[in-house]
Amino acid sequence: MTTTTTQRDLPKPEFTDAEAGAREFPDSNARRFSYYTPQKRKQSHYEDVTVEVQPDPRHYLSQGWLYGFSDGRGGYPLDWTALKAWGSDRPEPERFPGSGGRGYDWPATGWHEFRDPNEEWELTLYRYNANVVRQINANIDTARETKAFEQWNRNWVTFVERNIGAWMHVEHGLGLYLFANANRRAPTNMHNNAISVNSMHRIRTAQDLALYNLTLSEEIESFDGAAHIEAWNSDPAWQGVRKTAEQLTGIDDWCEAIFAANVVFEPLVGELFRSHLVQQAAPGNGDFITPTIVGAGEYDFAQRDLRYTIAMFELLTNDREFADHNKAILDQWLAVWVPRAISASRALLPLWSQPDFKPPRFEDGLDRAKSRFGGILTQLSLAEPKELTQ
């Protein structure tokens, strides 16, 4: 018996030249892009993967924002901060049939001129954080093998279980509720990347301290891994820091949040605690491990997070259209946050007397912190507020 197979008549593919890569046009085979002006003579890899990834209907995106909020506004409104960059007051171009959909020439507003000097994007974040965690783990493993934790005296164990753990709450709160929130509200992808990396530095540091707390609970028999909760909730020395940190997380203006945290709080409170207390007192009390954990977070701020912050606000204080406006706003923020930071710093004074081996005097450390803070303000062309003398 013979069976016959019926030939099926399938539609033949028709190429319409609508598929990606079908058309040839000037620069269609280029490996670099020309829709923006690079900061330097040549475009960098960082700029190619960052600039205009977040669109702006003032430049292109002629159909407007693809999504919006319940109040009718779409995308990333520029009034989410009181600061302004040149071009901010220009309305979005009106698009209508026959207009050609043309927006303002690049960069449309001064916000797009910001470049993170750290050139942060996804790859750099993963690589950097992985290297830090790898080094911290190696340090802790070495300390375990050499029984280094046995060299700690009792007072230092108490100091670490209460105060290093308490600082973990600061890192977690600011990372998750201040920087992550500010990242979503910033108007360009260059800002988004820099701020989100700042957020992840904070969250990673909080995680480092939490895991370190668990390690110490295993390695030191008398170590109370829950003592930091009581210190954070009720120790008078920490209530100023706690109050200020919680106030920081409640800031609505994303520029104010970054400015208050990185320009005011960190130099006057964070570096005072980490550099002028923990790093100074730990070696004399037999602890050479804690400074490596705390120092990783200190390096994040001093060498990376502060660097992009200065670049971001320096651009605004020298803006060709709104420099005076921005300086006036920043002076107002300084008048609010400097007294709070100084008050939080002074509340930490009792911690300086707790270790057996004492760090340099509290007032000396605070003077250095104030000097550092003044240097940052000078870079931003801002005057020191009178509140700094408190």
Give, region by region, the residue ranges found by the protein language model.
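Alpha-helical scaffold segments that form or flank carboxylate-/histidine-based iron centers
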Residues: 106, 110-113, 159-163, 187-203, ...
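Extended alpha-helical coiled-coil scaffold domains characteristic of the BAR superfamily
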Residues: 168-171, 202, 248-277, 301-305, ...
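Long, hydrophobic, well-ordered secondary-structure blocks that form the structural core
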Residues: 150-233
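Alpha-helical scaffold segments in carbohydrate-active enzymes
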Residues: 194-215, 268, 297-312, 340
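Terminal targeting/low-complexity segments that flank the catalytic cores of oxidoreductases
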Residues: 1-169, 319-390
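Acidic/His metal-coordination segments adjacent to aromatic residues that form catalytic metal sites
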Residues: 142-163, 223-263, 320-328
